[in-house]
């Protein structure tokens, strides 16, 4: 064996770390590259998120600016849209006249033109001779009359809106509308956004701006309009059905189902006379005293029960109208009476035997497809009874004095309508058989309903709603559940909350940006509760103008029944302010 190894054999085995240089260096570079790419992607995402947040904030700010602009310039925008609509209406008949004239001219060389009848006129031509009939699609002027001492008013779209516009366009002078509107102006002046929205300046001045009047009248119009989609008939329509059922029951006549809704609508003053006489007969005196409100729970928030369409037990138990319906057998049992409902079910009596449902099914044909059952969907029963109570109060109040009686009134249509020529003479005073409400119903209410069948009580008499709510507040009523009136001989004096202003709260949430529908519904229902209980309080007072004359004169510039008619219709009485 040789002591030396061959040259090609290494005497010491080489042991090297695997991939010591190349692969490890390559791995470090790859990891660093991946780390840098991840950081770059993360930074890119952060920049995108930052740009998104900035863009989102810009969009939100832009939306808020648009909302503020729309709220502040709502009336101007609506007026501009109405102006465009009126312009288009005026252009359309002119185009038809031009086309008709051109057609007649082209027919001069041909056969004689035929006779064309459309609407109330006709176009008859032979050869080149033609006479153009008025367009049947033209919107005719509508007329309403408020009192027997005035001329009729002509309007195109909305009587109240056009009356306000005419009043403020007539002169450059300002108008005052009583202490109530002055207090409202002072409250709004403290809010900068509403101050700009309603153009409120100089809070110490009693002058009321055009924007503030329109905003408040709009709120009054919405008090009895329930802002949910499940309401299919109005309070006026519900009241007409209940009134016709009571009218036939009081007179002990066979239920007349051969009439239409429009025919019954025109008979409302006579039906209210019969109802008034029946309530006075039941009371045994000449008053209408009774319970016209409803026994709600203290925790009630919404006027319309949201779940099962029923109110709590005994809500309708003491109401005068509902008890009269039950006494005359117009309804089979009292609402929410399980014993009566079970007894009727055991006897096999269905809804076809219910007189009120039969009347609703007949009168509401063509108005609504699915006629509601008032004892099930009790909102209609409650709103209808409240509307009847309100109509009864308005009728008795307006018929307490003649519009021709002399007074020291300051309101005059001649101030802004030079051709009004109001005829009021003391020699024409009639103390008996006063029919102010019947005249107003025929010349004003009926015309408004024909023009807009969806109108409600607050849209017809916003002033009555305003006075009712103000009367509830002045009597220290705190809302549903607090139904006890302060007794004159009580040992304690009941105080009221400082911010007990339901109409101002409703106005505030209605024009707030952004608007919260639930808060709007709560404020609306609170105002509706106050209106309902105010009617109850007013009907439990002697119904005459002298009873509330001082309050009406101080709060709303109403000095006699003539001005009261305009106050109920307009929601205000403007008196020219001379500085």
Curated annotation (Swiss-Prot):
GO terms, biological process: symbiont entry into host cell; viral genome packaging; viral penetration into host nucleus
Family: Belongs to the herpesviridae CVC2 protein family.
Pfam families linked: Herpes_UL25
GO cellular component: host cell; host cell nucleus; viral capsid
Localization per Swiss-Prot or TrEMBL: Virion; Host nucleus
Organism field: Elephantid herpesvirus 1 (isolate Asian elephant/Berlin/Kiba/1998)
Chain segments carrying region Disordered: 92-134
Subunit relationships: Heterodimerizes with CVC1. Interacts with major capsid protein/MCP and triplex capsid protein 1/TRX1 at the pentamer vertices. Interacts with the large tegument protein/LTP.
Protein's name in the database: Capsid vertex component 2
InterPro entries documented for this protein: Herpes_UL25
Interaction with major capsid protein/MCP, as annotated region: 1-46
Highest taxon above the source species: Viruses
Lineage: Viruses, Duplodnaviria, Heunggongvirae, Peploviricota, Herviviricetes
Biased composition (Low complexity): 101-121
Described purpose of this protein according to its UniProt entry: Capsid vertex-specific component that plays a role during viral DNA encapsidation, assuring correct genome cleavage and presumably stabilizing capsids that contain full-length viral genomes. Participates in the interaction between the capsid and the tegument through interaction with the large tegument protein/LTP.
Keywords per UniProt: Capsid protein, Host nucleus, Host-virus interaction, Viral genome packaging, Viral penetration into host nucleus, Viral release from host cell, Virion, Virus entry into host cell
């Amino acid at each position: 064996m040789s002591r030396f190894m061959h040259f090609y054999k290494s005497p010491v085995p080489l042991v090297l770390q695997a991939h010591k240089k190349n692969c490890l260096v390559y791995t470090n570079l790859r990891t660093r590259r991946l780390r840098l790419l991840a950081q770059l992607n993360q930074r890119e995402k952060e920049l995108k998120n930052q740009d998104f947040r900035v863009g989102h904030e810009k969009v939100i700010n832009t939306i808020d600016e648009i909302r503020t602009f729309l709220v502040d310039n709502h009336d101007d925008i609506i007026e501009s849209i109405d102006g465009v609509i009126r312009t288009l209406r005026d252009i359309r008949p002119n185009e038809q006249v031009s086309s008709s004239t051109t057609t007649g001219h082209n027919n001069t060389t041909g056969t004689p033109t035929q006779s064309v009848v459309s609407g109330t006129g006709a176009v008859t031509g032979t050869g080149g001779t033609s006479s153009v009939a008025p367009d049947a699609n033209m919107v005719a002027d509508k007329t309403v009359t408020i009192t027997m001492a005035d001329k009729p008013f002509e309007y195109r779209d909305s009587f109240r809106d056009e009356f306000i516009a005419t009043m403020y366009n007539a002169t450059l002078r300002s108008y005052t509308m009583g202490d109530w509107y002055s207090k409202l102006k002072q409250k709004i002046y403290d809010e900068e956004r509403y101050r700009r929205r309603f153009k409120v300046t100089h809070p110490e001045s009693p002058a009321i701006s055009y924007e503030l009047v329109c905003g408040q009248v709009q709120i009054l119009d919405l008090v009895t309009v329930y802002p949910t989609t499940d309401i299919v008939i109005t309070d006026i329509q519900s009241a007409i059905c209940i009134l016709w059922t009571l009218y036939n029951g009081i007179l002990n006549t066979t239920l007349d189902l051969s009439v239409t809704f429009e025919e019954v609508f025109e008979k409302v003053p006579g039906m209210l006379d019969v109802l008034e006489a029946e309530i006075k007969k039941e009371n045994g005196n000449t008053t209408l005293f009774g319970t016209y409100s409803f026994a709600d729970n203290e925790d009630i928030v919404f006027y319309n029960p949201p779940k099962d369409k029923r109110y709590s037990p005994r809500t309708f138990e003491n109401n005068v109208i509902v008890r009269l319906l039950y006494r005359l057998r117009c309804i089979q049992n009292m609402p929410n009476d399980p014993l009566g409902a079970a007894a009727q079910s055991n006897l096999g009596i269905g809804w076809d035997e219910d007189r009120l449902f039969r009347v609703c099914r007949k009168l509401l044909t063509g108005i609504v497809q699915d006629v509601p059952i008032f004892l099930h969907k009790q909102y209609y029963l409650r709103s209808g009874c409240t509307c009847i109570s309100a109509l009864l109060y308005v009728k008795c109040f307006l018929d307490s004095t003649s519009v021709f009686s002399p007074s020291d009134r300051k309101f005059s249509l001649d101030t802004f309508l030079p051709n009004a020529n109001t005829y009021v003479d003391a020699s024409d005073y009639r103390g008996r058989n006063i029919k102010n409400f019947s005249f107003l119903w025929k010349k004003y209410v009926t015309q408004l309903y024909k023009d807009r069948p969806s109108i409600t009580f607050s849209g017809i008499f916003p002033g009555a709603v305003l006075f009712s709510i103000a009367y509830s507040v002045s009597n220290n009523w705190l809302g549903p559940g607090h139904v006890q009136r302060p007794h004159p001989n009580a040992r304690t004096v009941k105080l009221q909350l400082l911010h007990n202003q339901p109409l101002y709260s409703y106005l505030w949430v209605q024009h707030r940006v952004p608007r919260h529908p639930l808060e709007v519904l709560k404020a609306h229902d609170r105002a509706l509760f106050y209106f309902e209980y105010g009617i109850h309080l007013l009907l439990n007072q002697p119904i005459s103008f002298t009873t509330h004359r001082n309050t009406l004169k101080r709060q709303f510039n109403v000095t006699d029944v003539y001005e009261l008619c305009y106050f109920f219709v307009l929601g205000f009485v403007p008196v020219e302010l001379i500085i």
